[in-house]
């Protein structure tokens, strides 16, 4: 069955339902674009290739899952080698017309179930059946336009002449590591392992973190730090970058901790260059986009708004506040409404 889901603030369920139904109807009326299809194909093949390359070191839980499905659902277990080769063989032949026709078969106006959930609060009115039906009718009559694909990113970075040099190389025979010292003082330590056939895991950090901020600035910025990457880099939005990375195995996550700042991530041999470009971009080309922070804040607020009504969370939060008495850098274990009111995106940036 076809399913869709939207997460909204309290009292905004009907707005969320309308947006969700509009996007479903847009796909139903106009279908997906050729670029979207090729991006999806590339991602499917990239994920299968990664699993295939590590087929001799598959985690047990993945194997157990297949065995359980085979026993309970009589699902075949041909193995990743067969799945990868077969997918490589038939996936290119899947046409846009086939995909769009399947969407039309899935999206129907009859036999539809809509479930709306929300907290019970004084003054908060839940949507009625008639209101839901009205939204559905409005979407049916809405004059929607096809999704327009933006131009893809050709290059994440503009060409530039690198002045970086390796000024020192050291090895540690006991640890099996090699350390490269660069002319800017950065030290790069790497070690070859056989844990995975095609995986590079990395972390980069420097001392400092949020400890360098004053107590007053920290309170304004602490919950904004995770949102900074939402703005994208080098003038490209996060959506642009996500599309650019389709078909690549690249994960890069910048962070600012209490005592350190840096990036964590992983990639593959062939995508290492892209991962390094993204790391460089986070350091040198982070976008300033207050609108992206507002969207992030609204999304986080919707998820956490009702957590204090959970007895277990309420106890954990109050217990933490008790332990952190007179600590000017502690507010709550997760950002609540009063924390977002103090948040200052410009200060954090």
Indicate residue ranges for each PLM-predicted region:
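Non-catalytic, conformational "gating/processing" segments within enzyme and secreted inhibitor domains
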Residues: 111-112, 345-349
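Proteolytic maturation boundary segments
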Residues: 38-42, 49, 69-214
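Peptidyl-prolyl cis-trans isomerase
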Residues: 94-98, 102, 287-288, 293, ...
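M16 family metallopeptidases and their MPP-like homologs
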Residues: 1-93, 111-119, 196-229, 233-285, ...
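Short beta-strand/turn micro-motifs at beta-sheet edges
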Residues: 190-191, 250-254, 348-349
């Amino acid at each position: 069955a076809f399913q869709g889901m939207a997460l909204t603030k309290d009292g905004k369920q009907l707005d969320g339902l309308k947006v969700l139904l509009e996007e479903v109807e847009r796909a139903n009326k106009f279908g997906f674009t050729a670029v979207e299809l090729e991006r999806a194909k590339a991602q499917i093949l990239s994920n299968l290739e990664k699993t295939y390359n590590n087929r001799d070191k598959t985690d047990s839980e993945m194997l157990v899952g297949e065995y359980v499905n085979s026993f309970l659902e009589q699902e075949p277990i041909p193995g990743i080698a067969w799945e990868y080769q077969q997918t490589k063989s038939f996936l290119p032949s899947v046409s846009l017309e086939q995909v769009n026709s399947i969407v039309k078969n899935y999206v129907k106006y009859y036999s539809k179930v809509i479930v709306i959930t929300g907290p019970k609060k004084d003054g908060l009115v839940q949507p009625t059946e008639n209101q839901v039906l009205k939204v559905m009718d409005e979407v049916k009559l809405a004059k929607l336009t096809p999704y327009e694909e933006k131009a893809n990113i050709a290059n994440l970075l503009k060409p530039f002449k690198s002045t970086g040099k390796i000024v020192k190389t050291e090895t540690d025979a006991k640890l099996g590591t090699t350390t490269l010292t660069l002319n800017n003082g950065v030290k790069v330590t790497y070690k070859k392992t056989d844990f995975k056939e095609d995986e590079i895991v990395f972390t980069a950090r420097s001392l400092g973190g949020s400890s360098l901020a004053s107590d007053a600035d920290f309170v304004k910025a602490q919950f904004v730090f995770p949102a900074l990457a939402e703005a994208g880099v080098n003038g490209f939005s996060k959506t642009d970058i996500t599309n650019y990375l389709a078909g690549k195995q690249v994960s890069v996550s910048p962070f600012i901790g209490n005592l350190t700042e840096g990036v964590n991530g992983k990639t593959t041999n062939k995508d290492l260059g892209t991962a390094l470009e993204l790391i460089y971009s986070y350091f040198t080309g982070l976008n300033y986009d207050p609108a992206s922070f507002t969207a992030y804040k609204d999304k986080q607020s919707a998820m956490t708004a009702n957590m204090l009504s959970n007895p277990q969370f309420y106890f954990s939060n109050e217990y933490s506040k008790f332990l952190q008495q007179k600590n000017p850098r502690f507010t709550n274990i997760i950002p609540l409404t009063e924390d977002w009111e103090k948040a200052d995106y410009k200060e954090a940036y």
